[in-house]
Amino acid sequence: MKRVALLVQYDGSYFSGWQRQKNAISVQEMIEDALFKVSNQMIKTFAAGRTDSGVHASGQVVHFDIDFVIPSDRYANVLNSRLPSTIRILESVEVKKNWHACYSAVYRHYRYVINNSKIPNLFLNKWSWHRYQKSLDEFLMSKALNGMIGEHDFYAFQKSGSTRSTSVTTIKSIEIERTEDLILIDIKATGFLYGMVRSIVGQLVLVGEKKISPEIFKDRWVGKKKQDVHESAPANGLCFVNSVYQETIFKRIDKNDLFPKFVIRGYS
């Protein structure tokens, strides 16, 4: 029996999220079905992040245990030939038996993309939130982030239905960058609450549109005023970029190649 890790990309718009569900198509189901076709074994997979319905991944990390003749580094190609084109395995490697895709992660990285152009762009629609009504002030949005780094209770940004025992987590970094009309919001944290990133982005957009002040933004999460957090950004703008571990797991793929990239209209 060996443990194999996969580096996975998927277009979340075709799936109900990572986790297997009874009446919907999930990424986990697709990968486990592909493993069954290969090995005739019922294999359970584990992921670094349980992305919600419609959320993409450019560097999801998955592991599974298997007793089969295929070399570990061959699973990427073998599975890709049995997966839909909306899921790609970038690399497969054997890892230690005590290594875990979720529990061994030091932190996870999500990126949210907002298209702030007044002109719609069909080729960006699937991968970004077209928020065009007002020009967003990214400097005000950045100001609102003051005090968020570190361990805090982010209950205000947790959607109902969470199975977590606590709403406390640690944000390692959160940055906002504008490239022409695209606004990129990168958040790295040890763990993410259910709906956390989309709730944060929804509130930041209100700050950027000057509908609420940076002070009100902070008061809502510090004061755990979940009842005041109504706006949530749509799923299509969110991408699980990668998860980081103490040791280097994947050798062939540079981490910079995992960032979602746009090469249209001058965006890159």
From Swiss-Prot:
EC numbers: 5.4.99.12
GO biological process per UniProt: tRNA pseudouridine synthesis
Binding site for substrate: Y110
SUPFAM superfamilies xrefs: Pseudouridine synthase
CDD domains (alphabetical): PseudoU_synth_EcTruA
GO molecular function, one term: tRNA pseudouridine(38-40) synthase activity
UniProt-annotated catalytic positions: D52
Catalytic activity: uridine(38/39/40) in tRNA = pseudouridine(38/39/40) in tRNA
UniProtKB keywords: Isomerase, tRNA processing
Pfam families the record matches: PseudoU_synth_1 (PF01416)
Superkingdom of origin: Bacteria
Subunit structure: Homodimer.
Protein role: Formation of pseudouridine at positions 38, 39 and 40 in the anticodon stem and loop of transfer RNAs.
Family label: Belongs to the tRNA pseudouridine synthase TruA family.
Protein name: tRNA pseudouridine synthase A
Annotated organism of origin: Prochlorococcus marinus (strain MIT 9515)
Lineage per the UniProt record: Bacteria, Bacillati, Cyanobacteriota, Cyanophyceae, Synechococcales
Gene that specifies this protein: truA
